[in-house]
Amino acid sequence: MIHVTVPATTANVGPGFDCLGIALSLYNHIEVEEIPEGLVIEVSGVDQDLIEKDEGNLVYQSMLKAFKAIGYQPSGLRIKQYNGIPVARGLGSSAACIVGGVLAANKMCGSPLSQDEMLEIAVEVEGHPDNVAPALLGGVVVSNRYEGKTHYVRALVHEDLKFLTAIPNVPLGTKEARDALPRVVAFEDAVFNVGKSSLLVAALFSGDLEKIKPALQDRLHQSYRAKLMSSLESVFLETEKAHLDSVFLSGAGPTVILLRWQKEGQREIKFRDIIYRMEENWEIQDLKGDNIGAQVLN
């Protein structure tokens, strides 16, 4: 039995739309083994009823992609998934399944694929690297596609960074969140995000944490996606009124994160108070960065 664990990820991180991601200390566990024939999938944990348990299962589909690249055909598979990452909440649940499947298949075959080869397979399944890259590699990752290849730069998440993560009990589909975005944006908004994302990446990579707060603002996606859920829009309005300037939408949403890096009790209390006043039930988890990424545990 091969056991792998994969971290959750937060993509975009404010202005870093479709290119910036950070691995977080929240995990999915996947166990796989080859069996004489057939396919057996068992799922437990968070949102287990939302996970397919047949050939449409994302872990299974990702394993098949890796097996094809390796040139191996298993006789049958048993897959056990334990979900710690909520589904369709903007925390990279799909990326975790994809990376876990690719890593497990590679290990089953004696690990012939390099890390970069596994990343390319994961990107092929997911369609973009912003979540799968930090899920596989850990840390803070800036990534992009150029001439059919994934290019990335990785840094460690600073040990002082904390991610106070508010997760609503209502999922938001990635397609719905993508469809909410405008096809054309104002030139000044594009320039605004280039400046903010450049400063944010420099601050995260250099460890100059005081430069993070003035770099987290966004004009390309958050305001449009916030309108998809009334309480989400209220969260952003209320946090702005409370001068909580390090709050951002995780991925496509609806999860919201307060990023902090020192003992900021009053800011945390304000954030929790705002979240708990919302209509939907929200769960708050205090997470940190994961600098290891996906790994085989046995």
From Swiss-Prot:
ATP binds at P86, V87, A88, R89, G90, L91, G92, S93, S94, A95, A96. Disulfide bonds: none annotated. InterPro entries: GHMP_kinase_C_dom (IPR013750), GHMP_kinase_C_sf (IPR036554), GHMP_kinase_N_dom (IPR006204), GHMP_knse_ATP-bd_CS (IPR006203), Homoserine_kinase (IPR000870), Ribosomal_Su5_D2-typ_SF (IPR020568), Ribsml_uS5_D2-typ_fold_subgr (IPR014721). It comes from the Bacteria. Its EC number is 2.7.1.39. This is Homoserine kinase. Belongs to the GHMP kinase family. Homoserine kinase subfamily. Keywords: Amino-acid biosynthesis, ATP-binding, Cytoplasm, Kinase, Nucleotide-binding, Threonine biosynthesis, Transferase. It holds the Pfam family GHMP_kinases_N. The keyword ATP-binding applies. Pathway: Amino-acid biosynthesis; L-threonine biosynthesis; L-threonine from L-aspartate: step 4/5. The lineage of its organism: Bacteria, Bacillati, Bacillota, Clostridia, Peptostreptococcales. Catalyzes the ATP-dependent phosphorylation of L-homoserine to L-homoserine phosphate. GO terms for biological process: threonine biosynthetic process. It catalyses: L-homoserine + ATP = O-phospho-L-homoserine + ADP + H(+). It is found in: Cytoplasm. GO terms for cellular component: cytoplasm. GO terms for molecular function: ATP binding; homoserine kinase activity. The keyword Lipid metabolism does not apply.
